[in-house]
Amino acid sequence: MSKLTHFDAGGQAHMVDVGEKAETRRVAVAHGSIRMLPATLSIITAGDAKKGDVLGIARIAAIQGSKRTAELIPLCHPIPLTRIGVEFSIDDAVSAVHCQVTAETVGRTGVEMEALTATSIALLTIYDMCKAVDRGMTIGEIRLLEKLGGKSGHWQAGNND
């Protein structure tokens, strides 16, 4: 197992030096879900939420959240994002909305945290917009699905966990 990179030899936290790393295309894909009452899911899919287009606003929130990742995660590098894609899917069988975010950059460090942050913010936004009708919604299963680029190459959940 690799050592933790955000701590120096004395155990003090520090921001990792990425200055010597090569600039490469980097991609990360994250996923998460929010489960809710079937009636709440119906409100979302029908576009009947009092606060507006739930998924449209959650998409914009995810993009904004990805851009703010370095402000929220203390040792995360601020990076120039080249693309953020946000996809939602409705799962009637379990009364859930699934969110998948793809983050891309050309840089010296990965975009995993940006993809994970965007996913989290999208799901939190859905909760915020629907909490008046369903305070029991459950957010979960937020995880990295895939990462490409950089020295460590390609990683995919389930293939080399």
Swiss-Prot record:
Report keywords, A-Z: Lyase, Molybdenum cofactor biosynthesis
Involved pathway(s): Cofactor biosynthesis; molybdopterin biosynthesis
**Where along the chain is substrate bound?**
L75, C76, H77, M113, E114
Any single GO BP term: Mo-molybdopterin cofactor biosynthetic process
| Catalytic reaction equation(s) | (8S)-3',8-cyclo-7,8-dihydroguanosine 5'-triphosphate = cyclic pyranopterin phosphate + diphosphate
Q: Which InterPro entries match?
A: MoaC, MoaC_bact/euk, MoaC_sf, MoCo_biosynth_MoaA/MoaC, Mopterin_CF_biosynth-C_dom
Residues in the signal sequence: none
Report the top EC class in one word: lyase
- Which CDD domains is this protein grouped with? MoaC_PE
Q: Which GO terms describe its molecular function?
A: cyclic pyranopterin monophosphate synthase activity
**Pfam families referenced in this protein's UniProt entry, alphabetically:** MoaC (PF01967)
State the active site. Answer: D128
Q: What is its EC number?
A: 4.6.1.17
Family to which this protein belongs: Belongs to the MoaC family.
Q: Which HAMAP family match?
A: MoaC_B (MF_01224_B)
Explain the purpose of this protein.
Catalyzes the conversion of (8S)-3',8-cyclo-7,8-dihydroguanosine 5'-triphosphate to cyclic pyranopterin monophosphate (cPMP).
Q: Fill in the subunit field for this protein.
A: Homohexamer; trimer of dimers.
Please identify the protein, giving its name as recorded. Cyclic pyranopterin monophosphate synthase
According to its UniProt entry, this protein's organism is Methylobacillus flagellatus (strain ATCC 51484 / DSM 6875 / VKM B-1610 / KT)
